[in-house]
């Protein structure tokens, strides 16, 4: 134990009275490059351009080209309640930092006092009972000499917690931008699904009426009528489902906006507008561009500083207190000659026996740092996985959408041919119903795939730390 304390004391002397452990950023537990394989083989050249070209591309006002979507995102950034809470958290941590920083400076107080008391005879210096008065005015100052860096360590920890809160706010803003974009895309996509269900229902109802007429003249069977009615009810279910979904999408979007949707919101072709191209850089760039990773590192730095404060608690604390002023038995005598007073009170506190409290506190701070290391590494791994998922989606959705578009075109041709053969008397109407069903399913799937493709691009934008006009390429400092 003595050797342990001696080594700490020696390290204090050699490091300028700071007991904060030397910080070394943990190595990123991810591979140097993005995944390779069939899902990534068709990515366009330039996808992994160096990170210095990415700041402008990650500006959300550039990435989202639809003016209506940009307007909604701006509204959410001004009104969202979750974002407002994170902003208030930043202010709270800023105030805590000011509290810890104030401990590094001397404290001064001034006061004016008056005392009037009756002393019994046995306590009176004259041997007679009497009433005494005393008036005083003082200016006092106290200052703790931070010889072992305890106060400085606490101030640094508070600063890092404040910076972590600021990065968390940035992360929340990026998440909000992505959530609003996806919610708006989902709303418009479900409106398109609802329009498709309505038009398909009308088509199925016309087919049902036609088959009923054929049934009356004996050219269609009861089975034909039942099959046609089944398609009508299926389309009616889809219409009801998407009517509900559109309403729920609007509710979700309004919650994100923090206010009602504008009544005059124009209808845009957002589902047909491609988003701006993104370059991903290298995995190491995530350390600079993801605010959640930077927040995790700030929390790790705070835990590291708290270890310094816990170490310093083993050593003496020295407090200097001084006071000066005047005192008199008469109020008008406070500023007469000979009424001055002063006091100087240095104090040294040395922990001798704390029943293991200091050792337990140091062990606790070391464990908290290990926890923060694990959280920092997990945030990097999570970011890597999110970007890799986005790249896999980008590498495959183009082909999937084209295949689904070809399927829709084929089923439209199939439907026209089936109806032509029915009109010519070659086939019965069941072939037409089957073609209608296949076309409806293909159109629905295309709308779903298109939404998923756009949503995956938005998630990739979020995973890359997008959303800010100027994303610092360096860790935040006190000046930031």
From Swiss-Prot:
GO MF annotation list: efflux transmembrane transporter activity
S-diacylglycerol cysteine: lipidated positions: 17
Query: What are the annotated GO cellular component locations?
Result: cell outer membrane
PROSITE patterns associated with the record: PROKAR_LIPOPROTEIN (PS51257)
* Main subcellular location: membrane
Q: Name one Pfam family in it.
A: OEP
Does the keyword Membrane belong to this entry? yes
Q: Where, per UniProt, does this protein localize?
A: Cell outer membrane
Q: Which residues, if any, are the signal sequence?
A: 1-16
Its topology with respect to the membrane? Lipid-anchor
Among InterPro entries, the record links this protein to: OMF (IPR050737), OMP_efflux (IPR003423), RND_efflux_OM_lipoprot_NodT (IPR010131)
**Lipid linkage positions (N-palmitoyl cysteine):** 17
Reported induction = The ttgDEF operon is induced in the presence of toluene and styrene, but not m-xylene.
Q: Which UniProt keywords apply?
A: Cell outer membrane, Lipoprotein, Membrane, Palmitate, Signal, Transmembrane, Transmembrane beta strand, Transport
Biological role: The outer membrane component of an inducible organic solvent efflux pump. Involved in export of toluene and styrene but not of m-xylene, propylbenzene or ethylbenzene. Is not involved in antibiotic or AMP efflux.
Q: Which family does it belong to?
A: Belongs to the outer membrane factor (OMF) (TC 1.B.17) family.
What is the name listed in the Swiss-Prot or TrEMBL entry for this protein?
A: Toluene efflux pump outer membrane protein TtgF
| Source organism per UniProt | Pseudomonas putida (strain DOT-T1E)
């Amino acid at each position: 134990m003595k050797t342990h304390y001696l080594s700490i004391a020696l390290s204090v002397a050699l490091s300028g009275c700071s007991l904060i452990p030397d910080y070394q950023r943990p190595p990123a537990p991810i591979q140097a490059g993005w995944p390779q394989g069939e899902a990534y083989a068709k990515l366009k050249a330039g996808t992994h351009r160096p990170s210095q070209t990415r700041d402008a591309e990650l500006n959300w006002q550039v990435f989202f080209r639809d003016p209506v979507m940009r307007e909604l995102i701006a509204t959410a950034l001004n009104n969202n309640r979750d974002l407002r809470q994170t902003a208030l958290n930043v202010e709270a941590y800023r105030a805590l930092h000011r509290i810890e920083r104030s401990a590094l400076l001397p404290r001064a107080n001034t006061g004016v006092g008056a005392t009037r008391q009756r002393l019994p005879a046995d306590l009176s210096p004259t041997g007679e009972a009497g009433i005494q008065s005393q008036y005083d005015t003082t200016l006092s100052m106290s200052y703790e000499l931070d010889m072992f860096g305890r106060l400085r360590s606490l101030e640094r920890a508070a600063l890092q917690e404040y910076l972590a809160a600021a990065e968390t706010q940035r992360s929340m803003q990026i998440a909000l931008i992505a959530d609003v974009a996806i919610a708006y895309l989902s709303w418009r996509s479900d409106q398109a699904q609802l329009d498709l269900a309505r038009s398909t229902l009308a088509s199925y109802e016309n087919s049902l009426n036609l088959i009923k007429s054929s049934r009356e003249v004996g050219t269609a069977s009861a089975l034909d009528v039942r099959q046609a009615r089944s398609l009508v009810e299926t389309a009616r279910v889809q219409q009801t489902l998407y009517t509900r979904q559109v309403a729920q999408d609007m509710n979700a979007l309004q919650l994100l906006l923090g206010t009602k949707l504008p009544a005059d919101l124009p209808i845009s072709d957002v589902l047909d507008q491609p988003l701006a191209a993104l370059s991903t850089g290298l995995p190491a760039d995530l350390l600079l561009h993801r605010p959640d990773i930077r927040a995790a590192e700030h929390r790790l730095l705070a835990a590291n500083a708290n270890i310094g404060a816990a170490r310093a608690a083993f050593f003496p604390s020295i407090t200097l207190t001084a006071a000066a002023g005047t005192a008199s038995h008469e109020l008008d005598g406070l500023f007469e000659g000979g009424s001055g007073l002063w006091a100087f009170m240095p104090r040294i506190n040395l922990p001798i026996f704390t029943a293991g409290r200091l050792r337990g506190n140091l062990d606790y701070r070391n464990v908290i740092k290990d926890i923060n290391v694990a959280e920092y590494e997990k945030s990097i791994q999570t970011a890597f996985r999110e970007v890799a998922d986005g790249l896999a989606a980008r590498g495959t959705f183009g082909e999937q959408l084209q295949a689904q578009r070809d399927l829709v075109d084929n089923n439209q041709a199939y439907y026209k041919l089936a109806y032509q053969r029915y009109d010519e008397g070659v086939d019965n109407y069941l072939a037409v119903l089957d073609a209608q069903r296949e076309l409806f399913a293909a159109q629905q799937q295309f709308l779903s795939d298109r939404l998923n493709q756009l949503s995956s691009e938005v998630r990739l934008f979020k995973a890359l730390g997008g959303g800010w006009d100027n994303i610092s390429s360096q860790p935040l400092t006190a000046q930031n």
